[in-house]
């Protein structure tokens, strides 16, 4: 179909021609009558003619060069050629689609563009052209109005869009802020969580640290307590060692004193039937034993309890040795005296037989009476060995006082307080001794024993111990012994039954702490010399008050106590002494002998019967002693004791009666009735207040 292709090319060329680019109104038929009328009417200038003359013609004249045309040719050509008129804007736009229609404000620009010279048409064409242009103007104005409205609408839309965009921006900002806030919250929660985890971990570490610190503190505290405990144990060990060492020295001192007493018995060697050298050899061995113990203890810093116990056993053996020797000496002296009496009686009988019936007259009174003289068989002074024993006890007591002199004379308030506490701890338990119950008595004994052993005891709400002061033990021993004797002087003197509980505690303490027993004897002998027995003699230059004090009287402001009170005190102390020598602490070691047993009671009775009686004193003391201790002596010595009672009745009563005045016969009669009753019934009753086995179960 090549012909068909050429047709399309023709149409395309026609469309591209000036005619083809013209715009045609399809609605011109609606106005056809007007158009036809215009064509039929006479031509006339268009209303746009003035605009053409003003705007188009000047430009056309400027564009034609002056050299090529002359005025004549120009005017001729103008007359020959058709008139030129400017193309309408619509026509221009039809020929040039790229140039859009412009509003009124763009006329100057259109005018500045080049204008094509068109031949002036007829008036009808000009009219049509003017209508077209008018229509275009109207259409342009409508377009301008529409454009304005469109612009306003667009502006409103733009404003609405702007407002919507602003709101969306706000929402976006809010959403972004919310997102940031949420992220911040999440971050803060994460940080808080991590912080809590860190704090939890830190608390866990702190707890572990506290636990480890607590364990470490406990270990440190235990170590410190262990160290303090070890230090305290070491201190106590040293103190106990020092106490044991002092005790060993005291034992050695006492052993040496006993050895001296043993050596002093050489004067009785002729009377003894036993070998004195054996006693001396054993005594020397015991002294060497204690010296060896002390020497070994010095090498090993402090003595042990076994060493002290061994030394105490050696001392007890030495005491027993000396006591046995004393008994042998007493027995030898008694045999010697009896032999001398028998020889004297034989000589007296021979003299009576030689003198005849006058020899059967009644002999004079054995005691020194009116106009008579003292019997030569009895003595006023005590035996030398007894006096030595008495003096040793007094020296030991004085030495003990000198030992704690620093404590008693100290001006330090702390030392004074310690002294008062120790004195109360030593004396108050003794004051509490009674016959209420055996368990109560045991508590008191344990408290005194603990105090003397260096253990702390409670006194006055405070803890007291002799280790508080180096001189504390000596002070307590002295004050304790003094209190025991004072209880006998006061309590036993008023209540005779009190002698037994006091005596059993004193005996038990004496057995465990021998030095206390020696101090008890020293205090007893000093306050009651008849307990030795010992009758002090008046010496030249001695004051009467001093002599009365030596006899045991209390002298205050140069006034001597009454005789009844004096006898009452002496009676209480003798009763206490008689109870001590027969009683033993029931919870002690029964295998050991009594530290001051019945043999000393027998010695006391024998020695007082060998001395001249004292008016009112001897009868009182004999009655008290026999009433308390007679039953025990009877069981111990049996026949020998009854012989002694018969001797008292037959030989000693006349001597007492001879020196006793009528106003002082009360004590003598009481002794005589008691003795006659015992001899009649051949029995001495158990003393009133004696502690039975049922008492210790209470």
UniProtKB/Swiss-Prot annotation:
Subcellular location per the Swiss-Prot or TrEMBL entry: Nucleus; Cytoplasm
Domain of life: Eukaryota
Residue span of region Mediates the shuttling between the nucleus and the cytoplasm: 444-483
Biased composition (Low complexity): 65-79, 86-103
Region Interaction with NUP155: start-end pairs: 1-29
GO BP annotations, alphabetical order: mRNA export from nucleus; nucleocytoplasmic transport; poly(A)+ mRNA export from nucleus; protein transport
Entry GO terms, CC: centriole; centrosome; ciliary basal body; cytoplasm; cytosol; extracellular space; membrane; nuclear envelope
Task performed by this protein: Required for the export of mRNAs containing poly(A) tails from the nucleus into the cytoplasm. May be involved in the terminal step of the mRNA transport through the nuclear pore complex (NPC).
Stated family: Belongs to the GLE1 family.
SUBUNIT field: Associated with the NPC, however it may not be a stable component of the NPC complex since it shuttles between the nucleus and the cytoplasm. Interacts with nuclear pore complex proteins NUP155 and NUP42. Isoform 2 does not interact with NUP42. Able to form a heterotrimer with NUP155 and NUP42 in vitro.
Name of this chain's protein: mRNA export factor GLE1
Organism, as annotated: Homo sapiens
């Amino acid at each position: 179909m090549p012909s068909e292709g050429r047709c399309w090319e023709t149409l395309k060329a026609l469309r591209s021609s000036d005619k083809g680019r013209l715009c045609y109104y399809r609605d011109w038929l609606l106005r056809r009558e007007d158009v036809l009328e215009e064509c039929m009417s006479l031509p006339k200038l268009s209303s746009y003619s003035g605009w053409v003359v003003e705007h188009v013609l000047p430009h056309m004249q400027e564009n034609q060069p002056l050299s090529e045309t002359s005025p004549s040719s120009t005017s001729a050509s103008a007359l020959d050629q058709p008139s030129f008129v400017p193309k309408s804007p619509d026509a221009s736009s039809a020929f040039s689609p790229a140039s859009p229609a412009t509003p009124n404000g763009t006329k100057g620009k259109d005018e500045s563009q080049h204008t094509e010279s068109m031949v002036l048409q007829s008036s009808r064409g000009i009219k049509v052209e003017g209508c077209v242009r008018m229509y275009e103007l109207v259409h342009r104005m409508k377009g301008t109005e529409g454009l304005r409205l469109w612009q306003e609408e667009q502006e409103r839309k733009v404003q609405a869009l702007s407002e919507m965009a602003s709101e969306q921006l706000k929402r976006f900002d809010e959403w972004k802020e919310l997102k940031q806030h949420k992220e911040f919250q999440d971050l803060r929660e994460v940080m808080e969580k991590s912080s809590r985890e860190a704090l939890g971990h830190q608390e866990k570490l702190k707890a572990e640290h506290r636990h480890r610190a607590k364990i470490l503190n406990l270990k440190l505290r235990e170590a410190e307590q262990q160290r303090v405990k070890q230090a305290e144990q070491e201190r106590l060990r040293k103190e106990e060692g020092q106490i044991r060492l002092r005790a060993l020295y005291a034992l050695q001192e006492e052993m040496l004193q006993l050895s001296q007493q043993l050596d002093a018995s050489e004067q009785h060697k002729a009377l003894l039937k036993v070998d004195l050298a054996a006693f001396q050899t054993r005594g020397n061995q015991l002294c060497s034993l204690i010296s060896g113990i002390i020497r070994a203890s010095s090498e090993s810093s402090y003595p042990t309890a076994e060493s002290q116990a061994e030394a105490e056993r050696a001392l007890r053996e030495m005491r027993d040795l000396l006591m046995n020797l004393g008994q042998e000496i007493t027995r030898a002296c008694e045999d010697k005296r009896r032999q001398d009496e028998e020889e004297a009686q034989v000589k007296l009988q021979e003299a009576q037989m030689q003198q005849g019936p006058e020899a059967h007259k009644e002999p004079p009174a054995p005691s020194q009476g009116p106009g008579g003289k003292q019997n030569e068989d009895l003595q006023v002074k005590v035996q030398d060995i007894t006096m030595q024993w008495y003096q040793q006890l007094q020296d030991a007591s004085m030495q003990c006082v000198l030992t704690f002199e620093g404590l008693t004379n100290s001006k330090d308030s702390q030392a004074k307080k310690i002294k008062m506490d120790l004195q109360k701890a030593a004396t108050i338990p003794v004051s509490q001794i009674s016959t209420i119950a055996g368990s109560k008595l045991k508590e008191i004994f344990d408290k005194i024993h603990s105090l003397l052993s260096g253990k702390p005891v409670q006194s006055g709400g405070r803890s007291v111990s002799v280790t508080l002061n180096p001189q504390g033990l000596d002070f307590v021993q002295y004050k304790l012994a003094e209190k025991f004797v004072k209880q006998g002087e006061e309590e036993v003197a008023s209540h005779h039954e009190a002698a037994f509980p006091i005596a059993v505690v004193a005996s038990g303490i004496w057995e465990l702490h021998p030095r206390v027993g020696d101090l008890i004897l020293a205090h007893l002998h000093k306050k009651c010399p008849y307990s030795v027995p010992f009758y002090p003699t008046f010496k030249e230059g001695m004051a009467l008050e001093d002599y009365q004090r030596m006899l045991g009287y209390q002298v205050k402001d140069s006034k001597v106590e009454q005789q009844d009170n004096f006898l009452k005190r002496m009676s209480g102390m003798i009763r206490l002494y008689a109870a001590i020598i027969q009683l033993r602490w029931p919870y002690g070691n029964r295998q050991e002998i009594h530290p001051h047993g019945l043999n000393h009671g027998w010695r006391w009775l024998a020695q007082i019967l060998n001395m001249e009686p004292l008016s009112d004193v001897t009868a009182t003391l004999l009655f008290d002693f026999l009433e308390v201790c007679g039953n025990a002596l009877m069981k111990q010595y049996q026949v020998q004791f009854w012989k002694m009672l018969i001797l008292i009745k037959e030989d000693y009563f006349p001597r007492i009666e001879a020196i006793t005045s009528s106003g002082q016969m009360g004590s003598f009669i009481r002794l005589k009735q008691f003795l006659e009753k015992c001899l009649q019934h051949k029995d001495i009753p158990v003393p009133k207040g004696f502690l039975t086995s049922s008492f210790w179960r209470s």
